[in-house]
């Protein structure tokens, strides 16, 4: 039984509709391109093999849409009012828009009874993650693909004839992308998507072979907006903006509420995959008033699986898997010099400027403003929520009948319950560059064409890069507790049982670059062996790449970067311009290599803002300097990464299988693992080596970089009162793996005064917690082990370098404020923390409660009263009991500030040297608190043999260090001797405040 719905459009269409013959406002006013494939079954089906498949696919591909009056105001509304384009409709505005929905749905009603009598087995997963081949297959697959683009390009001699960037819309009318002197150029892309796949089973499923019940939501969204202007007309001024607004929702859901009987293997899966690429790029190469790019991306991806009925199978895999990758960028360029990187650039703060330009009759005023102000800004705002969740509801019973032993006699899991949320790759950036260069004596270029005659100064250069990224990532398995009457708790029984929650933010930024290089290298290795040194240049680099791929790490990435830098250096620029300039594939290879020169490719969160200026011909007149040069980059990240396994009150989980008249106990593993490896970089650098070009081109240069990095990474296993855990070996594990790196670089040069400040603040929590209530019952024929491990590495690195003709002040401040807790405990975790006298238990209860919702706390019985506890304590029976908590890692803060005043500035020649000040200061502060504890309290422990033991241990091997340095240098005139230097100011402070405890206790 199959339902298939497919919809797609290629270039030349707009939501599948000819824009020339359709009212655009109606389309944007609520019409939606949607595909639906729905199957409803509420009767009896019997066959050897049964396949029920709902497949929906919705795709849209569109490079760009020429502006239409009715679209502009509507897109402004959809973009949240960020850009008021309503009065700025010109030939330079393009809009790209797509609103897509796709839904694949299978509903097996309560009156349905599906029976597959065949004994076919499941195959390996295909590219969509679907396992076919079983006797019974029920699946829903929804695919959504959207490509939206809006590109505006101006040309030399704009407005004369057909422009190179012109388009021919449907209907054959040619519209030229001529750039009016004062009208803006704008590219706007808006995309809204809703992708859903779901399978709901309320009836009966029976299979004599294997069975698959799965939902797959696969979403891929790409939105780009770009504007680039080129004009040779002197005095022209532009406002340029690129805007992307993306709202993405991707959901996969499976519900098993009926009775399911499978002789073979049952695969129940909710799978979501979300790929997001959004880019806003604004670039002007000559006269420009302001260049702006804004990227606002909101993405949600969810995989959710619920079991509420009775499920019996030989073996069963019950999983929710969510996989995410994203590349979200904003960058802008103003001025003559070009800042070109592999990742496109974007920028934008337009609102304050458009009030002037919206009145078309004031072109003279706009032209005048353009002589005094050159600005660029990149704003990137990202909000993501990604989750994978499995819930075993009240009343559910899961039973696996397989022996749990493979053909070679090895133990295999017969019940696998897992929630996996994985950020495979993530890159978010905001970069802005503003340039002011003089082309000849008496002329300036304030981000544009020279204005001659008077040598008018550019009053201000302003460049801003702003990134705000909020990410909430979680993986959760919830085994619900009993109802209010103490009945209905879930029962899970199988020979070997694994219950796992894994939430991972992976660092593998170089993987795609290396793959691309190796592919292109292999394609041409035989064709161009005659190019001297070409093939041997990459030997070391490729070897380092192989080492990195086998064991990805931040340090490994740095090794690769250095190796490829050496390779690029060994192939001179001459090769790129000549030998490599002719064969296209060799140029592609060089592009692959140069990708390693882009520092952003090594980071997850990147901001940079810079201004630059001076004279191309080396002239020295102060008239060629901007009066004020401002550059600021702001990098704000808030990341939550949580992995949780919750075993509710009264839940019964038993690793055992009946074999004839006996019962064989197996292995019960319950674990939560949270992994966060990320790098945030703030400031303009190359290979993480600081340059001093963040601010410049002005008599006074002011620059600042601010990084605020908040990461909460938590792994939690909690077992409620009255729960029963049984197996030969019972293992509970919580694992935190945090490598959080923030790097802030900055500085600049100025003719007279230079002031820079770098500030980076890292805060958050890293908690690895196992909490078992003392009213739970655990029976392990061999060993009970609780292992909490927390490896937290925090690096906060700041470097500031400033030089100026007269006054230079630089400051670097770094603060690390983190709580690191690592606790493994069997205690009264449903007690009120106020009543408990044990500080460690109070802290434990608080930590657990802070991570759980009110509903989740209720599943554990955390609201018990004193009278309730008269029901008695739990009991642990095992040959060996181990409760271990181990904390490790390195927390480092490094800040360095250096300044030079009175350095040999060209405009100091022949002038009286004014008073000069050089001051540098740096501060590095670490405030670290937390507990490492292993607790066994208030529970009866019985060892099963005379050689049994109880071991409780806690250790903290972490290292914490703060390092700070400052240097100030003042030099008079152009003297090279030591006599040219005089007193300076410099100061450095390093401070550690550490409040950590280590406790191992049996009570």
Predicted ranges, named:
Residues 1-1003:
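Low-complexity, glycine- and small/polar-enriched segments
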């Amino acid at each position: 039984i199959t339902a298939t719905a497919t919809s797609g459009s290629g270039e030349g269409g707009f939501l599948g509709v000819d824009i020339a013959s359709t009212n655009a406002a109606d389309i944007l006013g609520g019409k939606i391109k949607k595909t639906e494939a729905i199957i409803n079954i509420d009767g009896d089906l019997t066959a050897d093999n049964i396949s029920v498949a709902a497949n929906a696919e919705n795709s849209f591909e569109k490079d760009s849409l020429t502006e239409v009056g009715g679209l502009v105001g509507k897109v402004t509304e959809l973009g949240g009012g960020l850009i008021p384009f309503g009065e700025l409709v010109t030939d330079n505005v393009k809009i790209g828009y797509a609103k897509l929905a796709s839904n694949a749905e299978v509903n097996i009603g309560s009156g349905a009874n599906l029976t597959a009598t065949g004994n076919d087995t499941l195959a390996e997963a295909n590219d969509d993650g679907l396992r076919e081949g079983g006797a019974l297959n029920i699946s829903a697959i929804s695919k959504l693909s959207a490509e939206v683009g809006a590109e505006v390009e101006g040309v030399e001699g704009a407005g004369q004839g057909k422009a190179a960037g012109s388009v021919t819309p449907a209907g054959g009318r040619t519209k030229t992308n001529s750039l009016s002197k004062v009208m803006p150029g704008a590219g706007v892309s808006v995309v809204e998507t809703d992708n859903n796949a779901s399978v709901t089973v309320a009836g009966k499923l029976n299979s004599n072979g294997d069975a698959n019940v799965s939902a797959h939501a696969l979403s891929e969204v790409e939105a780009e907006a770009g504007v680039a202007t080129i004009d040779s007309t002197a005095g022209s001024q532009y406002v340029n903006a690129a805007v992307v607004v993306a709202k993405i929702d991707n959901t996969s859901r499976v519900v098993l509420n009926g009775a399911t009987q499978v002789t073979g293997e049952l695969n129940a899966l909710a799978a979501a995959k979300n790929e997001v690429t959004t880019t806003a790029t604004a670039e002007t190469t000559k006269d420009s008033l302001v260049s702006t790019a804004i990227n606002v991306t909101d993405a949600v991806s969810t995989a959710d699986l619920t079991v509420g009925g009775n499920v019996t199978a030989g073996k069963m895999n019950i999983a929710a898997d969510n996989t995410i990758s994203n590349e979200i960028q904003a960058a802008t360029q103003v001025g003559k010099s070009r800042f070109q990187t592999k990742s496109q650039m974007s920028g934008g703060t337009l609102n304050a400027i458009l009030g002037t330009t919206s009145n078309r009759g004031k072109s003279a005023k706009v032209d005048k403003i353009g002589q005094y102000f050159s600005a660029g800004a990149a704003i990137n705002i990202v909000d993501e929520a990604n989750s994978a969740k499995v819930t075993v509801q009240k009343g559910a019973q899961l039973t696996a009948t397989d022996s749990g032993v493979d053909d070679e006699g090895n133990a295999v899991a017969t019940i696998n319950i897992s929630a996996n949320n994985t950020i495979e790759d993530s890159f978010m950036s905001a970069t802005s560059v503003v340039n002011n260069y003089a082309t000849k004596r008496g002329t300036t270029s304030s981000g544009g064409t020279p204005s001659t005659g008077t040598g008018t100064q550019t009053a201000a250069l302003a460049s801003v890069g702003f990134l705000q990224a909020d990410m909430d990532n979680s993986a959760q398995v919830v085994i619900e507790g009993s109802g209010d009457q103490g009945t209905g708790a879930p029962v899970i029984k199988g020979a070997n049982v694994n219950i796992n929650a894994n939430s991972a933010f992976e660092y593998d930024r170089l993987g795609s670059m290396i793959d691309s290089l190796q592919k292109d290298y292999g394609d041409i290795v035989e064709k161009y062996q005659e190019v001297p040194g070409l093939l041997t240049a990459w030997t070391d680099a490729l070897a380092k790449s192989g080492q990195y791929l086998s064991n990805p790490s931040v340090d490994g990435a740095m090794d690769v970067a250095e190796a490829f830098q050496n390779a690029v250096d060994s192939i001179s620029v001459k090769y790129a311009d000549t030998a490599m300039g002719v064969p296209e594939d060799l140029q592609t290879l060089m592009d692959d290599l140069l990708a390693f020169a882009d520092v952003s490719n090594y980071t997850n969160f990147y901001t940079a803002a810079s201004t630059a200026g001076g004279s191309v011909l080396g002239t020295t007149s102060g008239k060629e300097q901007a009066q004020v040069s401002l550059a600021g980059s702001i990098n704000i990240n808030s990341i939550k990464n949580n992995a949780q396994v919750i075993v509710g009150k009264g839940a019964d989980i038993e690793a055992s299988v009946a074999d004839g008249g006996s019962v064989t106990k197996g292995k019960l593993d319950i674990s939560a693992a949270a992994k966060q490896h990320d790098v945030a970089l703030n400031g303009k650098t190359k290979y993480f080596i600081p340059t001093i070009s963040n601010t410049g081109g002005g008599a006074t240069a002011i620059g600042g970089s601010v990084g605020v990095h908040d990461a909460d990474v938590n792994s939690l296993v909690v077992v409620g009162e009255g729960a029963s855990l049984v197996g030969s070996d019972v293992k509970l594990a919580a694992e935190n793996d945090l490598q959080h790196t923030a790097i802030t670089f900055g500085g600049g040069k100025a003719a007279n005064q230079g002031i820079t400040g770098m500030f980076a603040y890292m805060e958050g929590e890293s908690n690895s917690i196992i909490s078992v209530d003392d009213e739970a019952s655990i029976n392990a024929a061999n060993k009970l082990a609780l292992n909490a491990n927390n490896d937290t590495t925090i690096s906060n690195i700041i470097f500031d370098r400033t030089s100026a003709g007269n006054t230079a002040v630089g400051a670097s401040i770094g603060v690390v404020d983190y709580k690191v807790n690592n606790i493994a405990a069997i205690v009264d975790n449903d007690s009120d923390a106020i009543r408990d006298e044990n500080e460690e238990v109070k802290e434990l209860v608080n930590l657990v409660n802070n991570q759980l919702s009110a509903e989740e706390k209720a599943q554990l019985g955390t609201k018990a009263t004193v009278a309730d506890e008269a029901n008695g304590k739990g009991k642990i029976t095992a040959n060996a009991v181990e409760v271990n908590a181990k904390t490790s890692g390195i927390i480092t803060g490094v800040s360095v500030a250096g300044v030079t005043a009175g350095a040999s500035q060209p405009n100091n020649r022949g002038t009286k040297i004014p008073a000069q000040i050089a001051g540098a200061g740096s501060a590095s502060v670490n405030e670290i608190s937390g507990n490492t504890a292993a607790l066994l309290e208030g529970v009866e422990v019985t060892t099963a043999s005379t050689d049994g033991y109880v071991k409780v241990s806690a250790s903290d091997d972490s290292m914490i260090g703060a390092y700070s340095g400052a240097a100030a240098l003042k030099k008079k005139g152009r003297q090279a001797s030591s006599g040219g230097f005089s007193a300076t100011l410099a100061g450095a402070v390093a401070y550690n405040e550490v409040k950590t405890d280590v406790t191992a206790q049996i009570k």
